[in-house]
């Protein structure tokens, strides 16, 4: 028959599965020896569990222990006190040279453009100090010490939770810790190998004329209808043509009030004059939106390779970043952010990454915890920063208690958990990721 062994090591970092072909009359001692042959774990360190019960009688057969075909056994590898004494003495030796010489590495990065580019992608804060030996050494040691503390803290938490391995709450916390580590690894992998996904994608705008008035129109093939704001409809002189019988409420991502509909009005796109109908709607941050109704009617093609809208053979180029409405940029500046690797910040809605140089500016707007730290040290010369922490006090108390306790269970103190929740607008998953990154 075949059984599966779920192996958990002493650190709790690695879990493996082992499939074994066994016989019903095989003793537990023979099974331990088979596991040792496959994994090199000594039988004295093997703690086997079946259906949540520790099995210790090595003389009993698998049949006597009620182990049947297809069963899974849990194996927890726990070193004895005498066996762990040797690694403790050996841990001092690797800690003696904990890292390479920072100055040697700095010179290597300066001499190798490829390595330097890699540092700029993965650790922008180090790359900014590469020409300052003292600053480089300081940041290098701080980074190494932080990683060591985080690793030791994770091991300590997992070891504490493994003291009661069949406690559902403990296992749920271990699962959350492992999941957050995978999320962080996934983020770092994306920033290293696919950094373009973190750039800001600007919307597609065109210069058009409606009834002779110039308007910047957003091209949105995901919108069902062509939309115009009441202010622009008034400026274009077509507000008097609104048929209010078509009023109502638009529901989608949120709701908006529909004032009515303009059944037809001339729109100039490029050199083409095209009749178009408009839905006049409040509550949108865009002056005019060319929807799918108009794009399909005139068989328009959004050609991203040419960065143009093609209508009836004419190519109308989309506006550049500097020409799009400023309201779009202001919305991006007000976007809440979370901390990313190497001192970067990541927008929660767009995923856009900002370097360390712009992190402090955005922290003053989005309110991460680091913006509140300089306030007490210099309240007098910086009234703007001193006023920022003022609304934080009531906000810190608004987080659910269970969210704070989840972060405390990951090794953070209560104040650190609250600051992490403030920095992520109450998102527990992002807050846990910040704590693991040394927030």
UniProtKB/Swiss-Prot annotation:
It is found in: Cytoplasm. Probable aspartic protease. May be involved in the regulation of exocytosis. Acts as a linker between the 19S proteasome and polyubiquitinated proteins via UBA domain interactions with ubiquitin for their subsequent degradation. Required for S-phase checkpoint control. It is an enzyme of class 3 (hydrolase). Residues 1-82 form the Ubiquitin-like domain. This is DNA damage-inducible protein 1. It comes from Neurospora crassa (strain ATCC 24698 / 74-OR23-1A / CBS 708.71 / DSM 1257 / FGSC 987). Binds ubiquitin and polyubiquitinated proteins. Residues 364-375, 383-398 have a biased composition (Low complexity). SUPFAM superfamilies: Acid proteases (SSF50630), UBA-like (SSF46934), Ubiquitin-like (SSF54236). Belongs to the DDI1 family. The keyword Protein transport applies. GO terms for cellular component: cytoplasm.
